[in-house]
Amino acid sequence: MEWDFIPRNRQKNIHIKERFTIMANKVLVETSARHIHLTEDAVKALYGEGAELIVKKMLSQPGQFATANDKITLVGPKGTLAVSVLGPTRKANQVELSYTDARVLGLKNVPVRESGDVENTPGLKMVGPVGEIEIDAGAIIAKRHIHMTPADAEAFGIEDKQIVKVKIESERTTIFDDVVCRVHPNFALAMHIDTDECNAAGAFGEVYGEIIL
């Protein structure tokens, strides 16, 4: 079963203090399926000269969107996978996988990294509707993390890059350790986990986790 980003389903005009009174120490947990971020040059190579990323739907993080462009095929030593492209374009190509995805592709030693940290990571082939490219690096397992604004961080008593635990209650209640908090004015409060983590915790549908400091 393929998962997608779960869009935010909350009222954004609720005052932050009221929101934390209602949802004390709670954070929305969103599951992020495998996907790629592309540079402008990669978009042209895969989709053709003059091609652009087309907005299909906006995601929970401001300015980020799922695209309506055809999926790209990732080609690894042992297998292939179709992946969605997220926008906007970036300065470096990035392939975000789960451990299961990496095994299907036959990629070894894919590191757990924060988004944007792609130095010394495996590369692979990408095949689009028009062309294909081979990237030297870019494949990562995304480190589980929480996006939050400075106001959110202040309310929680959390600093940028702080590591916390998050408890998700379900039929398979799980406490995730080593969750990095990423603080920026342009973020919206949400925790992101991958599909392996989602399945392990039974975190299906609209799910909230409890932040443990």
Which residue ranges define each predicted feature?
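Acidic, glycine-rich active-site loops and adjacent beta-strand->loop/helix elements
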Residues: 170
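Short beta-strand-centered segments at strand-helix junctions
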Residues: 28-30, 35-76, 83-129, 134-161, ...
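Short, Lys/Arg-enriched N-terminal segments with co-localized hydrophobic residues
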Residues: 3-22
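Short beta-strand-to-coil "C-cap" segments at the C-terminal boundary of structured domains/repeats
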Residues: 211-213
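Short coil-to-beta-strand transition motifs
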Residues: 173-175
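Extreme N-terminal starter segment of soluble prokaryotic enzymes
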Residues: 24-26
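Short intrinsically disordered, low-complexity coil segments enriched in acidic
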Residues: 1-4, 163
